[in-house]
């Protein structure tokens, strides 16, 4: 329905850039997209890149949107290769061979390509909680913390002539402590998540050995 009137805007919460690159791939295949908004939490390497051409590794900060708590976006190299460098493999390899010990800064002309398709935002925990509470109070819809990060950009930029699609990425029931703090009751928990937080966590250490790792996976599958 939206596409019948104009190109789409997408706001996507991200850590490792997989969902953003999927959206970009859809654009390459013909989906009518105006802007892809890259939404991150306090771990802002992607926001720093799109905002100021600074792709440098920094310490990870723990947030209430843990899947986005990263220092390096593992899928970002794909966009640099395909979109920014026009599939120049040697140039891309040169940039990332020195990363993360050395940050990445593109030349101004190359970096400015992002203005054609991308923008970004960074949202801290306090703002994330405010968004969750606001949407719940006014629309009776419960956002998970990751989706709430993306909702911020949509709330700021959307208008009657500028519609946004916000990508939802997780079920709220995975984050009970967040809603307890906001005094919001989780009325429904999917069967698959029932008892999840009571299960024993297990940690196994392995050497960098293919046979050892695959043998363990096979025996526990």
Residue ranges and their predicted role:
Residues 1-221:
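PLP-dependent amino-acid enzyme catalytic core
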């Amino acid at each position: 329905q939206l596409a019948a009137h104009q190109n789409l805007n997408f706001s996507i919460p991200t850590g490792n850039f997989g969902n953003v690159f999927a959206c970009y791939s859809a654009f390459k295949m013909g989906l009518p997209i105006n802007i892809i908004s890259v939404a991150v939490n306090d771990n802002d390497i992607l926001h720093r890149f799109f905002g100021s051409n600074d792709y440098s590794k920094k310490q990870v900060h723990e947030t209430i949107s843990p899947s986005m708590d990263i220092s390096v976006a593992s899928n970002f190299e794909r966009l640099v290769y395909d979109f920014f460098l026009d599939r120049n493999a040697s140039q891309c390899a040169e940039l990332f061979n020195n990363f993360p010990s050395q940050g990445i800064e593109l030349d101004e002309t190359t970096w400015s390509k992002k203005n054609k398709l991308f923008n970004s935002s960074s949202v801290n925990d306090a703002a994330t909680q405010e968004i969750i509470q606001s949407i719940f109070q006014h629309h009776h819809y419960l956002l998970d913390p990751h989706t709430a990060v993306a909702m911020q950009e949509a709330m700021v930029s959307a208008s009657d002539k500028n519609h946004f699609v916000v990508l939802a990425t997780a079920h709220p029931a995975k984050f009970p402590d967040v809603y307890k703090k906001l005094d919001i009751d989780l009325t429904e928990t999917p069967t698959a998540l029932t008892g999840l937080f009571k299960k024993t966590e297990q940690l196994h250490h392995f050497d960098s050995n293919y046979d050892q790792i695959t043998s363990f996976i096979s025996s526990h599958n």
